[in-house]
Amino acid sequence: AVARFFEATGKLFREGSTQSVAKAITKAVFENEQGQAQRLQTSSSVEHGQMLFKDANLKTPSDVLNAFAKLDSKMVKSHAAELSQLAERAMTEVMLETDSGKKLKALIGDDAVKSLAVRVVKDYGGGVAAAQKNPEVRINQMQAVFDMEVMHLKAAQRHIEGLASTDLNQGVYAEGLPEDAFNKVGVTNNVERAAAWIINASNSKGNDAENITSLLKEYATNGKDLLNMDNLKELHARLVPNVERDYRGPNISGGTLPSSIGGEGMLKQHIEGFLKENPVADKDLGKHLFAGVIGYHGFTDGNGRMGRMLYAIAELRNDSFNPLAMNAENSLHGIK
């Protein structure tokens, strides 16, 4: 292929005009798989668009999206996959610079908002067809999705952080579940009681009682920091193995749950930031962890089990276990 390239360009230099030589070299370099690979490795949609559309006047991601209106059917067909990636890339970059994107970034951080923007654009961006027709319409629709996410995250944050100034040892927060409601066989060991409570409260089928009991025993004494997101992720992976999905999108149909990406970002900031900057009593830590995990819903599955597991571990580390009643649970996590 390289030899044919030099043979062809050599002939053009000998026999062709300067314009035809330049055009042929440009085509040889950029209109092949190697050229495509180069474009896909560029640092931005603008650089990618300039190379693909051969237009140095493209200065912003919006310029790139507007350039799609000029594409002919031949170009769309011959570069379908690359154009799809470019459209999504440009839309993602536009979304990050909107007011909605900036508000979300302030809540969950740069990496999380970028990850969420990529997912939202894949779900709602409309790809090449939308970019050709009217990309502004799709951008506005996706901003509405971001705005809903911000609203849900802020509502959860107000409730969960508000618990730090609440006495969790009185009223509904102190309501316990009657022993016979979850401890069917009458075990007396606190680890086994905690395992029975977790299993009884879970809606998931096939909970592994042996695994839950083993994790409770291990974490009750291993001293691992429960205000560390990596430690929580490790525990969750062992508690809820074989999770089938890796993403839950923003709720736009009337519910209040945030996306899994937004929820994870908020949970990380809550345990590694808020709770460390606003330390709570050891006897209350389990309730705060329970509220944060379930209220922010940062995992795609098993948030209830994880929240109860952390509550139980915190209790066991204090040589006790007081099973929460449903009213107490609902008041702690605040999900409507």
Residue map of PLM features:
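Hydrophobic, membrane-inserting alpha-helical segments
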Residues: 1-4
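FIC/Doc superfamily catalytic core
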Residues: 10, 38, 42-45, 49-50, ...
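Low-complexity, charge- and small-residue-enriched intrinsically disordered regions
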Residues: 10-24, 28-32
